[in-house]
Amino acid sequence: MKKTVIRWAVVVLLLSFLLSQVVQACSGFIIGKGLTTDGSVMFGRTEDYPYPPDNGAHNKNYIVNPARDYADGAVLVDETFGFTAPHLAHEYKYSSTPDEARGDGSNGIYGAHGFNEHGVSMTATVTAIPNNKVLKVDPLVTSGGLGEPILIDYVLPRVQTAREGVELIAKTIDEKGSAEGNVIILADKSELWYMEVLSGHQYVAIKFPEDKFAIFANTYYLGHVDLTDTANVIASKDVEKVAKKADNYVEIEGQFHIAKSYDPSNYAEADRSRVYAGITLLDPQTSVTYEDSVFDLLRSPTDPNRRYSLQDVFALQRNRFEHLPQFLPDDLAGKVKQGDDGSNDQPTDATYKYALGNENVIDAHVYQIKDSLPAAFGGVVWLGLGQTRNTPYVPFYGIVTDTYEAFKNRSASYDTNSWYWTVQNIDKMASQHPDVFGRTILEKWQALEEEWIAHQANLDSQYAGLTEEAAIGLAYPITNDTLARSEQIFQQLKAVEAEMVAKLKEIDDHKKNPVTKLTDEATGISIANPNLASLEMTVLRLDPNSVQALAGQSYDAYDIRLAKTSNKKAVTQLEATTVTIPVKATAQVDKVVYVNDAGEVQSLKFTSDAEKKTISFVTSHFSIYAVVYKEAQTTTTTSASTSTTTGATTGAGTTTTSAVTKPTTSSSSASTKTSSSTTTSTKKKGTLPSTGEQISMVLIGVGIVGLIAAFFILKSKKKQ
């Protein structure tokens, strides 16, 4: 009983979306083989899911359904519309990309797209909205009619050619009706068919021309079709009659126009924006305008030499009006999404439009069919689960017998072992933090896609011309290679996801504990730490020959000290602090050391930034540090200088002020003894650099001797 209630609730909800004439769900394209760079046919679709509460977060699986034998009486059932059909005694193997929620009584299968073992490929559907006047004459059959949720699982197991698939759909609609208006694509290595389901029992399908391309969203686009050309057209017998009976029959240039006779009177804003964007992206010189009353389905590029690649169609499905600066994607506007309840068809701000690469995409796919490959291969599907904005397209042959485990995960919420949830999370982070990631994530995938495209082309060349028998014999080796490759790519996805999570955590931690940066203007030395706000830094640049333990080596030495700004009291120790020191552009750094009170030097771990010409290390003490170079350099004796930098409490880019004064002490004496260790925060006498109140006895001694010598010199002068 509960399942029945849920099922009818879903039906009512779906109907409310359909009748609203505003459904932001799915965009499709076709490019004939005469217009592609490699002579392949390409078609595909983005499956959008704008429905609350998920709104673009709806897990999709990618699976292979093995060939099966059924007993008499076995029935295929659609949970959404109640469509049923007897299973055949034997049904073919096929792949599909279903919803994870299938089979729970509240959600249909929605297999989306796939190949079967005979090389038939299919994507279903781009939902289309029939005109209300037509629906009064030929209503949709929402109880028992054929609809999107079951189409893939009904057609692919039963047909051996694309035409057979169209004929099966047509026959079923004649007998049982259609639950929805739909656009469907079926292909094999010989031909591709484009089919529009126009109302409860009306439809027209055409064999797609090899020299045309098409872009279509959630409405109808077929113009005049020669309904008598049965070799290239499959149509319901009453398609003109129903339009006339509905008083919605339209002619253009004296010929029956299918789309204008079955469409709503005007394109929905979301349909117009996507189709216009797609046409102008693929054909920049087109004369089409945004306000055109009709967008023709069959198109030729204005430039007769224009040819399209995989990268072009990936860019099409990712497009966010980058080539149309007058528009912005409406998912940036923070407004109610069009299509949620049908009440927001016209955007409040006309700048914001519904994009092809929108936030609601849950599954994008590109099918590439090459007639050089055996039919058993089907072709290649480039699968882009999740939003297209920041997720990669990964290639799979139609001949595979299994898919990687991460594609089968059926979690309804984030699961780290799910391919869908991983890429969805990557897109979410990239989209919500464009200031952090920019286009870096997309560019990473595009670089990998270049490699995969080249690799796939090599594989296609190897398999071209194989007999069907030889091709079938390769199914398992190819599957094993595909599983291994999927594992490798999934680990790349997880690594990127982990890096992004860590980056955002670092930023969040920084906001909670903002790092203050002190920079000494005279030397360019800077230190960074969350707790420098009330401190000042004093830097003494030492004479080049002042550290005896480094005698004969080329180095720069600095005495870095901290004190409280309020009372000038020296600070002896601080938590881990990053110190950055500029280095000579013409020399290579050998090591970084600090000098302890005894004049001994100890090596530090450091990192180099060749572009900025700096080195950085982490310490919790402040004393004398030296950057030692590998090659001896000409040194000049300069006077030591001291500069003081006062801390400020803003972020890492804080500008500070410096006051330069003459030094009051000389550098520490240095011995010839050298030891090597890694700095730690543990305080050990004679090993860690002295700081603040731990005043160097050597420096005090040198100072006292200097004062005594000065006293006697002055006294001697007075006597003279």
PLM feature spans:
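Histidine-centered catalytic/metal-binding microenvironments
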Residues: L442-K511
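C-terminal membrane-anchoring or membrane-association module
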Residues: V705-Q720
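A contiguous strand-loop segment
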Residues: C26-G147, L168-Y308
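Proteolytic cleavage junctions
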Residues: K568-Q573, T586-Q588, V595-T636, A640
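Substrate-recognition/cap regions that form aromatic- and gly/pro-loop-enriched pockets
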Residues: G334-G465
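Juxtamembrane/start-of-transmembrane alpha-helix segments at the extracytoplasmic/lumenal side
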Residues: P689-V702
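C-terminal low-complexity, Ser/Thr- and acidic/Pro-rich disordered "stalk" regions positioned immediately N-terminal
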Residues: V628-T691
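Proteolytic processing hotspots in large secreted/extracellular or virion-associated proteins
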Residues: K512-V515, T519-A522, P544-A598, E631-Q633
